[in-house]
């Protein structure tokens, strides 16, 4: 990218406000109130560039269809509870409890291993009641292929025990009727369920416009200059959720995650921000990285 092109694109996105931060300019707790990036236009450009390269990731296509359906129909929450708390059937629309457990099993492991762990859990314990009544060691054995089996088994068991004791049934469908903040409060009561897990449940299973920050999203956001290099994940989550338009959050998040997993150019840029990488033909984010090199 030429210097003139860099200047033109940088001006287009207007990276930082010239107004010094003070109490009146802090955007409701935004940790970086003077950082204007990412702009809505930049988010759209990055989304479109990654969509052209990858297409929409097929592993997230079903969640995308559920989002589209949810915006055009109102669910009967009680009916869903009666149906979805009984079995772990992959052919049905994923329940909130299924989704939460899947996300927990995906922590600190590969996607294929977490999928194998959930499939093994389903095969061993067809109903959530079976999991609740099982010995922790049996749950560990069922999910061992996903890694951290003792820790994850305890977490799953704690969730089920709390649901049974406090609500009388193993179901999280009631979360569909709550606001984002109410969902965060409810899920934070479960030991082992952290902010990223909650955000993933909000986006994938509850169809809220939330933007989870996993390792791939976090590192690319820093490399793009969307947050400072010194940012942590919590501040990145707050900033990106305030700056990225709601209508772009789901697609952009899925695409950044997918791209971060497979793009060697982005891995170089994350490791060494000033490293020379290939052309935009190989990675469409190269031109965006050029803005901050």
UniProtKB/Swiss-Prot annotation:
Species of the source: Arabidopsis thaliana (Mouse-ear cress)
Residues bound to DNA: 108, 151, 216, 232
Coiled-coil ranges from the UniProt annotation: none
Region of interest (Disordered), residue spans: 1-34
UniProt entry keywords in alphabetical sequence: Glycosidase, Hydrolase
Record EC number: 3.2.2.-
Record's protein name: Putative DNA glycosylase At3g47830
GO molecular function, one term: hydrolase activity, acting on glycosyl bonds
Positions of the catalytic residues: 196
GO biological process: base-excision repair
Key word Glycosyltransferase present: no
């Amino acid at each position: 990218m030429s210097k003139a092109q860099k200047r033109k694109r940088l001006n287009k996105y207007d990276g930082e406000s010239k107004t010094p931060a003070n109490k009146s300019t802090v955007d409701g707790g935004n940790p970086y109130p003077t950082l204007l990036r990412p702009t809505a236009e930049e988010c759209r450009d990055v989304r479109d560039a990654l969509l052209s390269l990858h297409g929409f990731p097929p592993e997230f296509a079903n969640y995308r269809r559920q989002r589209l359906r949810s915006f055009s129909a109102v669910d009967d929450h009680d009916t869903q509870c009666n149906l979805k708390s009984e079995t772990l059937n992959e052919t049905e629309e994923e329940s909130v409890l299924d989704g939460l457990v899947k996300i927990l099993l995906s922590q600190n492991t590969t996607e294929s291993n977490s999928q194998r762990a959930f499939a093994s859990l389903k095969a061993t314990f067809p109903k959530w009641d079976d999991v609740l009544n099982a010995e922790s060691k049996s749950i560990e054995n069922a999910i061992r292929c996903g890694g951290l089996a003792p820790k994850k088994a305890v977490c799953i068991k704690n969730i089920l025990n709390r649901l049974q004791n406090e609500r009388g049934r193993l179901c999280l469908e009631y979360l569909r009727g709550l606001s984002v903040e109410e969902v965060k409060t409810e899920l934070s009561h479960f030991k082992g369920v952290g902010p990223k897990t909650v955000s993933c449940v909000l986006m994938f299973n509850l169809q809220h416009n939330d933007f989870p920050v996993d390792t791939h999203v976090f590192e690319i956001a820093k490399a793009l200059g969307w947050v400072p290099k010194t940012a942590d994940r919590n501040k990145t989550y707050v900033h990106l959720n305030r700056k990225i338009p709601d209508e772009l959050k789901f697609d952009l998040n899925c695409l950044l995650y997918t791209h971060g997993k497979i793009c060697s150019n982005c891995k170089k840029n994350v490791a060494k921000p000033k490293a020379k990488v290939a052309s935009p033909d190989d990675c469409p984010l190269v031109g965006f990285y050029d803005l901050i090199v």
